[in-house]
């Protein structure tokens, strides 16, 4: 099963966010706030999916307070390149029940 999840280009099934995923979300929070012109008091990663490319894309559902959620895509380059995480996409005005999909 693990090998199926790691196929290049495929998106994994949604999983509960881990401390590592929360750390990834926290690192790109300033990028999202700059793009959306909003400040998020709460920024709690709930679930995530990953996609292996030349590096890894992380699709993360983030609870930002009340009934509000955002979906973000974070690119992590190959470890040996030692580059910072990059926010490459986002969707605002999402709900708890909105499916986390490729966008």
Curated annotation (Swiss-Prot):
Region (Disordered): 1-20
Record has Protein biosynthesis as a keyword: no
Site (Reactive site): 10
Keyword Cytoplasm: yes
Subcellular location: Cytoplasm
Highest taxon in the source lineage: Eukaryota
Sequence intervals crossing the membrane: none
Keywords, ordered alphabetically: Cytoplasm, Protease inhibitor, Thiol protease inhibitor
Short motif (Secondary area of contact): ranges: 51-55
Molecular function (Gene Ontology), one example: cysteine-type endopeptidase inhibitor activity
Function recorded in the entry: This is an intracellular thiol proteinase inhibitor.
Family note: Belongs to the cystatin family.
Protein name: Cystatin-A5
Organism of origin: Sus scrofa (Pig)
Lineage of source species: Eukaryota, Metazoa, Chordata, Craniata, Vertebrata
């Amino acid at each position: 099963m693990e090998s199926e999840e790691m196929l290049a280009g495929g998106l994994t099934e949604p999983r509960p966010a881990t401390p590592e995923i929360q750390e990834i979300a926290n690192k790109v929070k300033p990028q999202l706030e700059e793009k959306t012109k909003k400040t998020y008091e709460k920024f709690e990663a709930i679930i995530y999916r990953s996609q292996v490319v030349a590096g890894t894309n992380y699709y993360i559902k983030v609870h930002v307070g009340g009934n509000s959620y955002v979906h973000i895509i974070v690119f992590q380059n190959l470890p040996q390149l030692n580059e910072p995480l990059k926010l490459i996409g986002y969707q605002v005005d999402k709900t708890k029940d909105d499916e986390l999909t490729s966008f």
